């Protein structure tokens, strides 16, 4: 009997649960370790903020999925992995041994971007603790957004600043501006939303046409884009040129950083802490370990840490875990040359990005809505 430990219920891991449900493996004893029975879907976060979805619409219940797959669900936070000893330790002190390990625990928000420009200075000052909200973990953000919205609507003036110009930062800014202004009405002119990101960091990797569409949408929504970097100071945000940038709340959409316990695991990792895997998503150093989603990296330049690749890699991960347990051949996951990105723009409007092609409109939002709801339904039992 092989012991299979699944860590995290991310997009790729959902495919593993589905595969185990389709073909119960009598020779595998599997357990899923995750902090919560709910897996939140990041693709629907902007729609939740904008008011199009309830929180319950945006999450997957892992309990029936695990039960259907014959997988034990153990609620807990992984905090330590000793890869050479094949041991996983949880926050409450218990440990799990494994023969086969599948990692899809996601990542953390890279708050180092906001840290003061002093060697070794942490983002731990009182102002940041009170005013900076990281996008991850998602469950925390989903819980806090209604409180943030209530504070903004109760104040005579309120400035919400999103730091980060990637797709996540843009979507959050547009969604927040739409929600706050719709709830406040025309009589409340004191709510402002801005985005802090260097010009080159606004939607990096997307075609110029997409960036132009998004720039126009931000302007039409009354969102100020400040093309500078910033760091957290004792009295607020400081721009790269030294000026104070007052904000009542800062949402950090500053990209992802590797989870520290994986960096210390003994697995082969990149310089910035991501687990290195090959095209089969097998660890380059420990063949009994597989990883997918935000926690890993590949040498393939087409591969990026995104939900798109995590979803597409899922079936390959599922096949390879079972194949490795049985001594069978592994499959490769080959990323597509271009990935489709659908960028929500606040109201029921979205921008499509695929290579150099782009489009926008209500029909793109309906397309995105259909894809997102289908993903939730496909993982519901």
Pin down the residues of each PLM region.
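Beta1-alpha1 glycine-rich phosphate/pyrophosphate-binding loop at the start
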Residues: 1-72, 170-205
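Glycine-rich, N-terminal phosphate-binding loop of Rossmann-like dinucleotide-binding domains
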Residues: 9, 105-106, 254-255
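A Rossmann-like FAD-binding core segment of flavoenzymes
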Residues: 73-76, 80, 96, 180-278
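FAD-site-proximal beta/loop scaffold in flavoenzymes
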Residues: 128-155, 237, 244-312, 319
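Rossmann-like dinucleotide-binding core of oxidoreductases
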Residues: 159-205, 213, 224, 308-321, ...
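C-terminal auxiliary extensions adjacent to catalytic cores
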Residues: 341, 347-381
